[in-house]
């Protein structure tokens, strides 16, 4: 049954050119539900293969958009472990074109929250225009 669910998730991913992930920052990481999704799609021989030079992704020609929400400000700091983690997991399966838009500082007061959301919305609109 687990292999069937995994095959279904992989088929969904293979059927589309763009993957959009909406990802809150939970304790400097990704939500457990997203980790479980990655556990379903990261399969040797299906989404990547092992070679003498390391793993090679099999899902070519796809891109990902990561939309993130964060209570504090982490982008560009050592505490932003989420962005490299997602890039590594996506890269493992061959998705190396990854755009990110983060609304940061959402727990730092209403004024900061509104400014962050306005900026994120503008970045999303610009990203959509480029697709």
Residue ranges and their predicted role:
Residues 1-14, 120-127:
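Glycine-rich, highly charged phosphate/nucleotide-binding loops
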Residues 5-84:
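Helix-loop-strand module that forms the ligand-binding subsite of alpha/beta enzymes
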Residues 76-131:
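Glycine-rich phosphate/pyrophosphate-binding loop and the adjoining helix
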């Amino acid at each position: 049954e687990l292999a069937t669910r995994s095959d279904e998730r992989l088929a969904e991913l293979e059927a589309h050119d763009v993957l959009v992930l909406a990802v809150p920052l939970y304790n400097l990481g990704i939500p457990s539900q997203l980790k479980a999704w990655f556990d379903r799609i990261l399969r040797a021989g299906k989404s990547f293969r092992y070679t003498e030079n390391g793993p090679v992704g099999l899902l070519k020609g796809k891109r990902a958009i990561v939309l993130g929400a964060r209570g504090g400000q982490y982008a560009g700091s050592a505490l932003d472990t989420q962005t490299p983690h997602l890039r590594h997991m996506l890269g493992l399966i061959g998705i190396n074109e990854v755009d990110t838009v983060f609304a940061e500082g959402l727990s730092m007061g209403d004024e900061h929250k509104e400014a962050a959301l306005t900026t994120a919305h503008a970045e999303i609109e610009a990203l959509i225009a480029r697709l």
